């Protein structure tokens, strides 16, 4: 589904504790309405829903510069219901579509030590560029992830990752 403030807010209000910690450390606050209004303006993205229509995950790409997108993702505890399908959709459709639209580089950040996020980023084709020491609002370390259009062209030739969220 398209990014809509009410759907983003529903995911944000029910997001996993670890995602909430990460958002707070990034200074994005814990105000679901504010986060929803901000991400609804993202140029790229969607809401992933369960079969019953419940919003489960928000994926948003904000264009920071022409060709450079900052990627945000958070989800509810129901993510395992759609994790594999969501990963496949991102790899097969979303990421190649971003490249076709002229995105040269996507970046994302995750709390250092958030092992699930690290595994998932790798399964999507991202690579860890560096550790951002004391980057978080409370001095937490973050990993900066990158994915370039060259990486995407190479990854399309690789077998698909199968890790479910």
List each model region and its residues.
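Conserved acetyl-CoA-binding loop-helix of GNAT-fold acetyltransferases
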Residues: 82-98, 119, 123
């Amino acid at each position: 589904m398209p990014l809509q403030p009410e759907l983003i807010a529903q995911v944000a209000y029910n997001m996993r504790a670890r995602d909430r910690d990460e958002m707070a450390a990034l200074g994005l606050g814990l105000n679901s309405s504010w986060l929803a209004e901000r991400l609804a303006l993202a140029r790229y993205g969607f809401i992933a829903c369960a079969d019953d229509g419940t919003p489960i995950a928000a994926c948003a790409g904000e264009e920071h510069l022409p060709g450079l997108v900052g990627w945000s993702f958070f989800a509810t505890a129901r993510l395992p219901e759609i994790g594999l399908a969501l990963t496949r959709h991102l790899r097969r459709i979303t990421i190649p579509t971003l490249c076709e639209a002229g995105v040269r580089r996507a970046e994302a950040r995750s709390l250092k030590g958030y092992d699930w996020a690290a595994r998932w980023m790798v399964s999507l084709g991202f690579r860890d560029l560096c550790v951002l020491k004391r980057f978080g609002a409370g001095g937490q370390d973050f990993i900066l992830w990158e994915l370039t259009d060259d990486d995407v062209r190479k990854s399309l030739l690789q077998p698909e990752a199968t890790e479910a969220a």
